[in-house]
Amino acid sequence: MDYPGNLFVVAAPSGAGKSSLVKALLELDSHVQLSVSHTTRAPRGQEKHGREYFFVSEQEFDAMVKADAFVEWASVHQHRYGTSKRAIEERMAQGADVVLEIDYQGALQIKKLFANAISIFILPPSWDELRARLERRGEDSADVIELRLKNAAIEVAQVHKFDFVIINELFDRALFDLKAIVHSQRLKFSAQRRARAETFKALHIF
């Protein structure tokens, strides 16, 4: 189905800066809305239920899987994450641009179900910098950091399957690139014809 809103799918290895970039984008562009996923992991830091994620139990997650409530779900770092199809479609139907923060497995599943979804992969500038960021975050033990780096190698190997790639070396530059991708989709013919219908009509463009 052709919705007036766009769907942006943003994936990255842990520590690449995906969440920080998406948060900054949301603060700058009120037309972009975050699709909040469900997860079985515990909240981190200042995270709140319903804002960053819907935090649910394993049993609740199982029930949603059985009810076919997710457009995709995957296991990441020993926890499960799922995306509600209904929530995405309702927001896009209202004309909002929806952004999904998701792992690469989920991103590729979303692309199969939403053919027009725009996929974006965030890369770190180097492996050393990725390790340093994970260590500076101070949230994980040394063993967990090693697991995240191991998983990151698997995730980065999928980068060629994405539409756009942003290297997050300088945050402001990476944010500029992310904003440019979002804006470019709004300038496509179909989007402009819908958003500027009166102008197109006056110019006899149908």
Curated annotation (Swiss-Prot):
Enzyme Commission number(s) of this protein: 2.7.4.8
Entry's Gene Ontology molecular function annotations = ATP binding; guanylate kinase activity
Q: Which residues cross the membrane?
A: none
GO cellular component entries:
cytosol
**Broadest EC class?**
transferase
| Every Guanylate kinase-like domain range | 5-183
CDD domains assigned to the protein according to its UniProt record, in alphabetical order: GMPK
Reactions listed under catalytic activity: GMP + ATP = GDP + ADP
Q: Does the keyword ATP-binding apply?
A: yes
Residues binding ATP are A12, P13, S14, G15, A16, G17, K18, S19
Could you confirm whether the keyword rRNA processing appears in this record?
Answer: no
PANTHER family, per this entry?
Answer: GUANYLATE KINASE, GUANYLATE KINASE-RELATED
Descriptive protein name:
Guanylate kinase
Could you read off the lineage of the organism from its UniProt record?
A: Bacteria, Pseudomonadati, Pseudomonadota, Betaproteobacteria, Burkholderiales
